[in-house]
């Protein structure tokens, strides 16, 4: 998945790329820059965002990983911000994520694009497809007609996540109502900073 800015001008991706790394207070940012900054903050909390990495480096990291293992890295293509690299039965591959009108979605052929679900963040998109793969995958299935099945099942972490983060993931898998838990407000705030299961 590669994050792509769909703007008609040739410099739209460059402008979006510069906004992706924009720091500063939310009051100083345009709405689009604020959305991108929030998406980057969420992505940075995952532990599976690798930042700057080449295609070959991603392939090397995923070479011995089980099928379904994935990571997100910066795209080396100037029209895109991010790429998800995933291990398939045929080896590592890369997929695109498009960014348009404040939404993220998988890149696809034109006739399918309008049917693809859109998300407010990259992490929400990944979380959705990981959960969908858990629901659909019952075991190894032989590809038909040369088709390679793509499963997102397990992130490849840059380093071991903290115990706090693993606990947060476990709680998110068990409940969607954090505010109703008998926990201190500060802990509820921490849990709500990252509402995803992956």
Curated annotation (Swiss-Prot):
Keyword Lipid metabolism (UniProt): no
A GO cellular component entry from the record: cytoplasm
InterPro entries: SH2, SH2_dom_sf, SOCS2_SH2, SOCS_box, SOCS_box-like_dom_sf
Top-level taxon of the source organism: Eukaryota
GO molecular function (one): growth hormone receptor binding
Sequence ranges assigned to domain SH2 in this UniProt record: 48-156
Main location: cytoplasm
PTM comment text: Ubiquitinated; mediated by AREL1 and leading to its subsequent proteasomal degradation. Ubiquitination is dependent on its phosphorylation at Ser-52, by PKC. Ubiquitination is stimulated by LPS.
Annotated region (Interaction with AREL1), positions in chain: 1-75
Keywords, sorted A to Z: Cytoplasm, Growth regulation, Isopeptide bond, Phosphoprotein, SH2 domain, Signal transduction inhibitor, Ubl conjugation, Ubl conjugation pathway
Matches recorded under SUPFAM superfamilies: SH2 domain, SOCS box-like
Cell compartments where the protein resides: Cytoplasm
Cross-link (Glycyl lysine isopeptide (Lys-Gly) (interchain with G-Cter in ubiquitin)): 173
Annotated ranges, domain SOCS box: 151-197
Residue pairs linked by disulfide bridges in the UniProt entry: none
Chain positions found as Phosphoserine: 30, 52
Entries under SMART domains matching the protein: SH2, SOCS, SOCS_box
Functional description taken from the UniProt entry: Substrate-recognition component of a cullin-5-RING E3 ubiquitin-protein ligase complex (ECS complex, also named CRL5 complex), which mediates the ubiquitination and subsequent proteasomal degradation of target proteins, such as EPOR and GHR. Specifically recognizes and binds phosphorylated proteins via its SH2 domain, promoting their ubiquitination. The ECS(SOCS2) complex acts as a key regulator of growth hormone receptor (GHR) levels by mediating ubiquitination and degradation of GHR, following GHR phosphorylation by JAK2.
Subunit and partners: Substrate-recognition component of the ECS(SOCS2) complex, composed of SOCS2, CUL5, ELOB, ELOC and RNF7/RBX2. Interacts with IGF1R. Interacts with DCUN1D1.
Domains (record comment): The SOCS box domain mediates the interaction with the Elongin BC complex, an adapter module in different E3 ubiquitin ligase complexes.
Protein name, per record: Suppressor of cytokine signaling 2
Organism: Rattus norvegicus (Rat)
Gene assigned in the entry: Socs2
